[in-house]
């Protein structure tokens, strides 16, 4: 893993690194303010860590918010067992490098029943391994606030979600019953059993994320950069064919393609894109002319119309 400039920046305010663009600096300040507000206001916060680019930026901001101390809350990874191998390797390196407290949770029912995206379909698999698994982990830790890396530009239901997203005791989200947010004033008062999902990156865009990664030299999973990789075409997506658990269907042929991923999740449900972007500059240039959302590469968002809002109402990330 390449060395990361954040270590130098966090420990040396007089670093010679160029100052942030004013737009990125304003976003950074807002996110850091949100982290500190939640840490002061809630008893048991936790940060949802899904290992992708947004989680990497979220972690960097959390480290900045509480420097020179350690991040004062644990990271929670709801593992499904079907993440890209590169993601798990990256996660373990980051946890060790930054001395983080990581909680890993796999839904025991799903594991016992061998729930997979191949045998149960994307909708049921996601409900059991992600939504149910997340609710289990939050209940076990008695967490009253959970940071997430969702952004409003990603998808319609996320566009209308507040920065403080209130959840019922069974973790459900009612978009009709949310509190107004005036400027940077957040109302974190909750009843016993209720909780809040907090989204410090709400006002960031995908391009903002990448420009910040570039400016701060934040480590990310190599899958975001183009490389020749084995793939198969399935359900209108290019699926990475590097895991022996992926069984080829009779009409499928594995082939090498120059690809990268705009979004990372479970490998059987995440589509790659053809790309020649091998550097941060290339990725940013590619995104500046993109006409579709990064979520187009997620099979779980195609289950039905409004599927993301339905999942969020049931307790999804």
Curated annotation (Swiss-Prot):
**Keyword field:** ATP-binding, Nucleotide-binding, Nucleotidyltransferase, Transferase
Q: Matching SUPFAM superfamilies, A to Z? A: Adenine nucleotide alpha hydrolases-like
Gene Ontology terms: biological process = hydrogen sulfide biosynthetic process; sulfate assimilation
Q: Which GO terms describe its molecular function?
A: ATP binding; sulfate adenylyltransferase (ATP) activity
Stored InterPro entries: PAPS_reduct_dom, Rossmann-like_a/b/a_fold, SO4_adenylTrfase_ssu, Sulfate_adenylyltrnsfr_sub2
* Enzyme Commission (EC) number: 2.7.7.4
Q: Could you confirm whether the keyword Transmembrane helix appears in this record?
A: no
Q: Does the keyword section mention NAD? A: no
Q: What class of enzyme is it?
A: transferase
Q: Hey, which pathway is this one from?
A: Sulfur metabolism; hydrogen sulfide biosynthesis; sulfite from sulfate: step 1/3
Reactions the enzyme catalyzes: sulfate + ATP + H(+) = adenosine 5'-phosphosulfate + diphosphate
UniProt xrefs under Pfam families: PAPS_reduct
> Which parts of this chain are annotated as the region Disordered?
1-22, 298-317
Quaternary structure, from the entry: Heterodimer composed of CysD, the smaller subunit, and CysN.
Family per UniProt? Belongs to the PAPS reductase family. CysD subfamily.
HAMAP family the UniProt entry points to: Sulf_adenylyltr_sub2 (MF_00064)
The task this protein performs is described as:
With CysN forms the ATP sulfurylase (ATPS) that catalyzes the adenylation of sulfate producing adenosine 5'-phosphosulfate (APS) and diphosphate, the first enzymatic step in sulfur assimilation pathway. APS synthesis involves the formation of a high-energy phosphoric-sulfuric acid anhydride bond driven by GTP hydrolysis by CysN coupled to ATP hydrolysis by CysD.
Protein name (Swiss-Prot/TrEMBL)? Sulfate adenylyltransferase subunit 2
Organism of origin: Rhizobium rhizogenes (strain K84 / ATCC BAA-868)
Designated gene of the protein: cysD
């Amino acid at each position: 893993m390449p060395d990361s400039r954040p270590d130098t920046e966090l420990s040396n305010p007089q670093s010679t690194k160029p100052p942030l663009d004013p737009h990125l600096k304003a976003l950074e300040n807002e996110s850091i303010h949100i982290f500190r507000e939640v840490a002061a206001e809630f008893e048991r916060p936790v940060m949802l860590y899904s290992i992708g680019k947004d989680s990497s930026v979220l972690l960097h901001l959390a480290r900045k918010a509480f420097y020179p101390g350690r991040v004062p809350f644990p990271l929670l990874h709801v593992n499904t067992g079907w993440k890209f191998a590169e993601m798990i390797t990256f996660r373990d390196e980051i946890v060790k490098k930054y001395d983080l407290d990581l909680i890993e949770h796999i839904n025991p029912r799903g594991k016992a029943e061998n729930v997979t995206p191949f045998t149960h379909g994307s909708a049921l698999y996601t409900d059991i391994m992600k939504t149910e698994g997340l609710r289990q982990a939050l209940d076990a830790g008695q967490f009253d606030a959970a940071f997430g890396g969702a952004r409003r530009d990603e998808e319609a239901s996320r566009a209308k979600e507040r920065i403080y997203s209130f959840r019922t005791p069974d973790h459900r989200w009612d978009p009709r019953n949310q509190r107004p947010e005036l400027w940077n004033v957040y109302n974190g008062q909750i009843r016993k059993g209720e909780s809040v999902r907090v989204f410090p990156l709400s006002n960031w865009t995908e391009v903002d994320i990448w420009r910040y990664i570039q400016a701060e030299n934040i480590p990310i999973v190599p899958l975001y950069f183009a490389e020749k990789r084995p793939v198969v075409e399935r359900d209108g997506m290019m699926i990475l064919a590097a895991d022996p658990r992926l069984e080829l269907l009779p009409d499928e042929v594995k082939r090498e393609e120059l690809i990268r991923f705009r979004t990372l999740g479970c490998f059987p449900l995440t589509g790659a894109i053809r790309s020649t972007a091998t550097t941060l500059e290339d990725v940013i240039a590619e995104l500046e002319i993109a006409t579709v959302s990064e979520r187009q590469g997620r099979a779980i968002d195609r289950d039905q119309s409004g599927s993301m809002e339905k999942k969020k109402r049931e307790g999804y990330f």
